[in-house]
């Protein structure tokens, strides 16, 4: 048994569209960032240097003073907010006490606070770790010498802990203890800590102005993480392809929820989205090549991106999307309806595809698709590099499709391209393609056309008002006009009737006189007739 499978290229008629210069250059899956998840990340700013404590005490003390200058203002703002946000356990008194979840803010103690700061303060209160969890976290970090570690709490929540300078201490300083003097080790660690402090200042500097509502991007946080951003994202469960999209869309954000001055660490609440692929939706990218009709250069106006799902075709707004490795990842829904005329255009009815003049802007003169060159050789120089012959395009042709059977090595617009076997027809003749209506996209042209249309509408309005006045005049004089017409008609009919009566009367009299007149030579035969009958005669 042989099963024949027919491969459907999609709902878009690429063959017909290619005749008017529309080429599909790329197709991507459609993914949306759904509701964000939250993960705690602890950034330990002071490395564990118990092995080399004697050599680095002075450098660590100086570094600690610098850290306090950054951490103390942030800690004061966080403490002020968390102390003045309390849980609202109940309302009312007695047996009929109503209980519900919520928080209440002591506005008098806070003083001036914006709506964003109050909202961030409530979120800070709800996401803040309790004192017991902080104490357990501090003890775990003091015993850890790993650059990246996972700390499991009693509630089974996993906290990712990062020690920014610990890798340098473990891999550079400790192995060099036998080869370098104690003073040199202290100097090297001091330089590293000073550099790390400048990175911290660049990351958390904005938080000094507004520690409550300030957000930190994961890109900025990567400096404080010691360049371990990929490992952190892998801990959050992102794949390699998704990782690039998440970073480009700045989907991962972090907020400071706690500062521990004694342990010298910061607790960050990281918000990261979940990617969800919309099955069946394919996003297509369209490119337009200009074509010539006589001396005028045109191109077809189509959206840059469209999406297909089954038989449906819709518009696609790429402003909130990032395109990476066969995927379009968007921070919101980017699909919206498409007009029926544009759908007919994409399904192959070229008469429904609008076109506009290439004026003042440089459009695509050629494009490489499926190994073939689709070019408007009437507006640019197309030359076969192998034979040094010019590839001409006659005026009755819209486009020229160049493949290896025409020329294997093509020089076009100063670029030399090696083409493959033929995938498109040789040429497209203007007489065989039904072109769509011409429109203007330039702002000045659109404004001029709109002004002309408005003027024509005003002129038409004046003419309509004049015609209405004429119709009103005719309507008012309808009875007098009818009377004037009926009067001569009635007189004429009366005269004709009298004339007919006279003619008929004369004709009747003439016939009657002929029927009663007796000829004088006529003598009746009265033989055998009685005298009385003769007398009667």
Curated annotation (Swiss-Prot):
Lipid bilayer topology: Single-pass type I membrane protein; Single-pass membrane protein
Record flagged with keyword DNA-binding: no
Pfam families in the record: Fusion_gly
Site residues by UniProt (Cleavage): 99-100
Entry keyword set: Cleavage on pair of basic residues, Coiled coil, Disulfide bond, Fusion of virus membrane with host cell membrane, Fusion of virus membrane with host membrane, Glycoprotein, Host cell membrane, Host membrane, Membrane, Signal, Transmembrane, Transmembrane helix, Viral envelope protein, Viral penetration into host cytoplasm, Virion, Virus entry into host cell
Disulfide bonds: 321-330, 345-353, 377-382, 384-407
Family classification: Belongs to the paramyxoviruses fusion glycoprotein family.
Described purpose of this protein according to its UniProt entry: Class I viral fusion protein. Under the current model, the protein has at least 3 conformational states: pre-fusion native state, pre-hairpin intermediate state, and post-fusion hairpin state. During viral and plasma cell membrane fusion, the heptad repeat (HR) regions assume a trimer-of-hairpins structure, positioning the fusion peptide in close proximity to the C-terminal region of the ectodomain. The formation of this structure appears to drive apposition and subsequent fusion of viral and plasma cell membranes.
Descriptive protein name: Fusion glycoprotein F0
Organism: Phocine distemper virus
